[in-house]
Amino acid sequence: MRSVTLEEMMEAGVHFGHQTRGWNPKMAPYIYGERNGIHLIDLIQTARLLSEASDFVLNAAKEGKEFLFIGTKNQAADIISSEALRCRSHFVNQRWLGGMLTNWPTIKTRIKRLKDLEQSEKNGTLDNLPKKESAVLKRQLDKLRKYLGGLQDMKTLPDVVIIVDQKREMNAVRECIKLGIPIIALLDTNCDPSLSDLPIPANDDAIRSVNLIISKLADAIYEGQGIK
C-alpha cells in the first residue's frame, strides 16, 4: 500500500485548518503555525497518523471486521458513499438518525421495511396498488433509501467507524463512545482529538482533502479484505 506524500497533501489543501479564533486547544500538537488568521496543520503528523490508521483498518479488514463510514456534509457525502461501496463497507451520508447504533434493533426493522418495499417495487406490487396508497409507499421507500440505503447489508453493529467532520457528527461520536466502537476521525483544527481513537488531522471542508484521506483508508480496507 503506497503512503500518501506531503506533495499530494499540499496539493489537496489538507494543511488548511479553520480560523484561529475557532480552534480547539487540544489540536495544538497537530498545528505548526498560522497564516492570515488560518491555522496550518502539521502534515508530518497527518502522514504519520494516516499511516497508523491505514495499518489499523488493513489488519482489521484481514480479520473480517465491518466498517461504517459517516460523513453527511455536502463536501463529503458522495466521497463517503463511493469509497465505502468500493471497499464493501457501510455508510451514512445524508443525516445521522438518533439511535442508529445505540438503538440498532429498531433501525434493523426499518432496514427490513426498506428491503420489503424494494422487493415490492421490483416485482410490480407497488404499481398494482391504488394510486394514493402506491404514492404513499413510494415516498416512504424514497425516504428509507435516502437515510438507510448505505446500511442495507449491515447485519450487526460495525467494528470500526470512520468519520468526517467530528463536530457535525457528534451524535454519532457519542453513540460510538457509549458502545465502545473504535473511531477513526478526520479532524480539523476546531475538533477534539481526545474523542477519537485514531485521529487524523486534516482539512475537513475541502473536497480534495476529504477524498485523499478517505480514499487512502478505503484502499487499506480493500487491500486487507484481499488477504485471507
UniProtKB/Swiss-Prot annotation:
InterPro entries xref list: Ribosomal_uS2, Ribosomal_uS2_bac/mit/plastid, Ribosomal_uS2_CS, Ribosomal_uS2_flav_dom_sf
Where is it predominantly found? plastid
Where found, per UniProt?
A: Plastid, Chloroplast
- Give the Gene Ontology MF terms in alphabetical order: structural constituent of ribosome
UniProt keywords (A-Z) are: Chloroplast, Plastid, Ribonucleoprotein, Ribosomal protein
**Which PROSITE patterns does this one have?**
RIBOSOMAL_S2_1, RIBOSOMAL_S2_2
Give the Pfam families listed for this entry.
Answer: Ribosomal_S2 (PF00318)
Query: Into which family does the record put it?
Result: Belongs to the universal ribosomal protein uS2 family.
Per its UniProt record, what HAMAP family does this chain match? Answer: Ribosomal_uS2_B
Q: Which PANTHER family match?
A: 30S RIBOSOMAL PROTEIN S2 PROKARYOTIC AND ORGANELLAR (PTHR12534), SMALL RIBOSOMAL SUBUNIT PROTEIN US2M (PTHR12534:SF0)
Protein name as catalogued: Small ribosomal subunit protein uS2c
